[in-house]
Amino acid sequence: MSDASLLAAAPLPSPLQALVEAGLAQRQRGYRGRFAPSPTGALHRGNLRTALLSWLHARLRGGAWLLRLDDLDTPRNRAGAETSILDDLAWLGLDWDGPVLRQSERRGLYATALSALRRQGLLYPCRCSRRLLAPISAPHGATAVYPGTCRAASGGWGPAQGRLPSWRLRLEPGRLHWLESYGAPGELDGPAAVGDVVLRRADGYLAYHLATAVDELVLGISDVVRGDDLWSATGAQVAVMAALGAAPPRYGHVPLWCDGGGRRLSKREGAEGLAAYHQLGMDAAAVVGQLAASAALVPAASRLSAAELLQQLSSERLDQVLRGAQA
């Protein structure tokens, strides 16, 4: 989970503690995976392939596969995106267990966890603006490790100059660990590679890392299969789980689908989704075949349903292919 020196677990309110304990007990009873897209647009073929791999990983192990919509960042959500996501998954035959979960309907749960961390002294207010932090931004636009500018500041939690602070999780020296099935080894230096992550933004929105960490625990998620672009986000989520006194699930970070130039497919760059396949007259069997072939699970030009693909594979074969893809 993490080195003992990294942070101390926060005492949780009894209702939240009960939910976390129930989730961890659920994890022990059997496999529970999840797919968690954000409704910021239609799923592109890279998202769809990751969904297929996650679904296969769960079903080949006789496990449950939950569908959670990470829709907390409401300004980025797009009208019709949720319906599109659900329709696309159903059309491909990727069935999920239980009702669709929406993070926007679980804000109270995340706020309770945030309050517990604050009471324990594991958070501090940060008044650094994006402009102030711009010089330490990575070249590709991601924010580099926060330098701790406000860590020792004496500012309060209220507004100053009309602006509320963000809330950061205080990480002490130590390393973060998680079980990793496919990606790079699951170990990071907390302060050097992760830093004091924001759990509540200055605009009042609860942060992705907080909500994701709480959900993995409370929902009893045992295995997370997702794109390897999220490997670097795992450390922050593991740190939050450690602060809440719980171990993380097992992770499997799988390769992303890249275009001919080696660039990963993205919504921002207009990567094609199912609409493009529909325009070509491709049915679900042809699309599943192409998605599976791109991951080296079947020969090129294969035609088969998701259920037929499931019958052809074993968990050992899937593991072998995904581990080989990372070699």
Task: Enumerate the predicted regions with their spans.
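Short helix-capping/linker segments at secondary-structure and domain boundaries
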Residues: 59-64, 219-220, 245-246, 295-302
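Active-site neighborhoods of enzyme catalytic cores
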Residues: 3, 81-193, 303-327
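N-terminal Rossmann-like or analogous alpha/beta NTP/dinucleotide-binding catalytic cores
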Residues: 2-141, 228-229, 233-246
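Alpha-helix boundary recognition
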Residues: 115-118, 217, 278, 292
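Short alpha-helical "patches" and their helix-cap loops
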Residues: 66-73, 253-255, 303-313
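Active-site cores that bind ATP or allylic diphosphates and position pyrophosphate for catalysis
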Residues: 132-267, 273-278, 323, 327
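Noncatalytic linker/hinge segments flanking ATPase motor cores
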Residues: 44, 106-111, 169, 254-255, ...
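Non-catalytic terminal extensions that flank enzyme cores
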Residues: 1-41, 158, 174, 263-327
